[in-house]
Design a protein with these regions (language model features):
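Hydrophobic, aromatic-enriched interface-forming segments
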Residues: 112-114
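N-terminal beta1-alpha1 cap of cysteine-dependent amidohydrolase-like domains
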Residues: 1-106, 116-117, 124, 128-160, ...
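Surface-exposed interaction regions that form or flank ligand-binding interfaces
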Residues: 212
Length: 249
């Protein structure tokens, strides 16, 4: 079976430079995929042209800065961190284009939030001031590979299937989180304080987590297995699409 091509969204910093933590593309390569980083194109026509040329199989929305609250029709609150409207526009356009092509999507941390906002949901801009929870630790100071809280997955969900467990110790690096869940998405993972840690739309092969599995792969077969399982699902979807195209030719 051909290795699936995975689009990775990138970050844009204050100096207008593209950047990405290497764990994202390393995780894809180790799991049997081919990563391709997409530049921050702003026009939908440019995104469509790029996708037509690349012929990718799936999209991974990576982590990064806060999401500008104007994207979900709210005004900023005290505690909001750095935002990048440029990145918001780029990723929202990219997600829409990939979904129209029926591509599987994986969101990580900020990526989960982008998916929820794109589909009509909203966010708590700052967990501490708006949600009032300090029980679970969501902005850890420990090394990123260290688990600081546990996520409970719904039995029979994509989350449980991909991670092959119902209870998963994870890291945590966020202060925004899901508030109103988009209608098409299902919450499949939470922490004990009620913070949403996994969202999914199985019929569209859309899955997202609030934590960073890519940073916990070293010596952790569960996190490595997650990426392998996801890449296998992507490859299966791509194979089915190609078979259908061949039948119609």
């Amino acid at each position: 079976m051909e290795k699936p091509v995975i689009i990775l969204s990138c970050d844009v910093n204050e100096r207008d430079r593209m950047r990405m933590r290497q764990e994202y593309f390393e995780a894809v390569i180790e799991a049997g995929g081919v990563p391709v980083v997409m530049p921050p194109l702003m026009l939908r026509s440019q995104i469509d042209e790029w996708l037509d040329r690349i012929d990718a199989d799936a999209l991974m929305l990576t982590g990064g800065c806060d999401i500008d609250p104007q994207t979900f029709r709210e005004t900023p609150v005290r505690g909001l961190g750095r935002v990048s409207l440029q990145r918001d526009v780029y990723e929202l356009g990219l997600l829409e284009a990939c979904m129209l092509r029926g591509m599987p999507v994986l969101g990580i941390c900020r990526g989960l939030q982008v998916i929820n906002v794109a589909l009509g949901g909203s966010l708590y801009q700052d967990i501490l001031s708006q949600m009032g929870t300090e029980f679970a630790r969501h902005q850890q100071k420990e090394p990123t590979e260290v688990a600081t809280h546990e996520v409970a997955f719904i039995a029979g969900s994509m989350a449980e299937n991909l991670f092959q467990t119902q209870f998963l110790p994870t890291n945590s690096h966020h202060h925004q989180c899901v508030h109103r869940v988009a209608d098409d998405l299902t919450v499949s993972g939470t922490t004990v304080d009620g913070v949403v840690e996994a969202l999914e739309w199985p019929e569209r092969e859309i899955f997202a987590v609030q934590f960073h599995p890519e940073r916990m792969r070293d010596g952790n077969p569960t996190m490595c297995g997650f990426f392998k399982n996801w890449i296998e699902r992507v490859a299966a979807v791509a194979s089915t699409k190609k078979s259908e195209i061949a039948k119609n030719d």
